[in-house]
Amino acid sequence: MKTVLIQVGKTVNKHFIAGINDYVERINHYMPFEVVTIPELKNTKSLSEEQQKQTEGELILKQLQPSDTVVLLDEHGRQYRSIEFARWIENKQQTARRLVFVIGGPYGFSPAVYQRANEQLSLSLMTFSHQMIRLTFTEQIYRACTIIKGEPYHHE
């Protein structure tokens, strides 16, 4: 199974970039993992929040294949403890060809993206910046990989 993380806009904080790159490299020792960055919209002052979500949504949908299992990182999604998330990933490895996680733009997702999604996942009841969640989520994917393999990274 290939796992993909789609994100809207570049990560700009050099410390986050270094951390994300480190976890992506580690994850690739366990499974094929790729980060796809959709360019940030330009000249958004004349666009409403809904128009921005619509345009970003179209760009997100273009990245998806019909057979993809699509999971949105969304504040209203299901929450898992790390071990539960690892078991969820392990199950998806048996049933999905390509597992695609999506981190939306600053205003969230368009209705079309919600409609296409198979599931929604929330990492916390708290709100994080889109920049921060990229690092946090890649670490959680890595943590799940080590739990699945029984390696001593995660401590209960």
Show the residue positions of the predicted features.
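Short glycine-rich anion-binding loops that position phosphate/pyrophosphate groups of nucleotides
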Residues: 11, 75-78, 105-108
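Short glycine-/acidic-enriched loop or helix-start segments at secondary-structure transitions
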Residues: 15-17, 81-83, 110-113
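Structured adenosyl-cofactor binding patch, chiefly the S-adenosyl-L-methionine
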Residues: 111-155
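Short, surface-exposed alpha-helical segments at coil->helix boundaries
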Residues: 17, 21-24, 54-57, 111
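S-adenosyl-L-methionine/SAH cofactor-binding core of RNA-modifying enzymes
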Residues: 32-33, 37-97
